């Protein structure tokens, strides 16, 4: 049965003081970035922004006109520059998210983005083989070492150093910006495992968290040379679990947020789905349940996880559906209180979230259109 008692509050419109002070630190350390100066976003409607945790969204000049997903969205270290992937389009903004223009057509209709240093990013197809490097407005197609990519990580200290993970749990390493690759370390769960995700620590490529089908989670801190099985994903000792997604907090490498299912709890005829959000404070070795799948906090197997870049206690996640024109809930979990705040908008979903490097209270949202509304 689902555990009860998660407190859900109404629209959260302020950022806690601790995060405000951290945001000031971020502004000091982020050269050239500023908050968007516009009140309306010029673009096709794929990206908007909010300054109040989603209580209000900046209107857009365009409206999404077809089934659309914006899976890729990153803020670069080039001042005021962001990239987004809307279906097979690569879009770019150079004014902190006020204006978006198409710069290229990509070789996949569904691509994620991982930012690198020097104004670079990598575009990649989740559970597919498409891979490209984006330098400014130039897109260079790369050969992926895996036909089923489940994660890409970059090195802040070495611009050309990038890692990639395949759905078998194998890591690959490149020191020439993705031109060539070599296998690295051992399989995350051994031969025959199906891996949903590998999340790389943005501060340390050697630290990565893997999630698998029935195998739960695993973590490496030595670039895949060794992997340690995670505990706490099932309430039953030795119980199996699925770990669909994980994200290492940019604010504290010891904090990892994850999405999974306790397969013991979700056993046939149990009446429970066993779906939860989890939090680890030891880098992904042990997890504690923090949010259950309830009518107040809806979770799916693909719930988006977006940890705050400045506050390791804060996680944003979302639930959206076109069914009965429900719209989208944007949630904010705070580990200090265990409470979840919620705001609502009319869009069909949020596919991606990025944060303004100088003003982390400015959140950029990649939007979905699943059913055209007339």
UniProtKB/Swiss-Prot annotation:
Subcellular locations according to the entry: Secreted
SUPFAM superfamilies: Oligoxyloglucan reducing end-specific cellobiohydrolase
Signal peptide from the UniProt entry: 1-26
UniProt xrefs under Gene3D superfamilies: YVTN repeat-like/Quinoprotein amine dehydrogenase
Principal location class: secreted
Record key words, sorted: Secreted, Signal
Residues passing through the membrane, by range: none
Gene Ontology CC terms, in alphabetical order: extracellular region
Cited function: Induces autolysis of dispase and thermolysin.
Note: On the 2D-gel the determined pI of this protein is: 7.1, its MW is: 39 kDa.
Protein name: Dispase autolysis-inducing protein
Gene field: daip
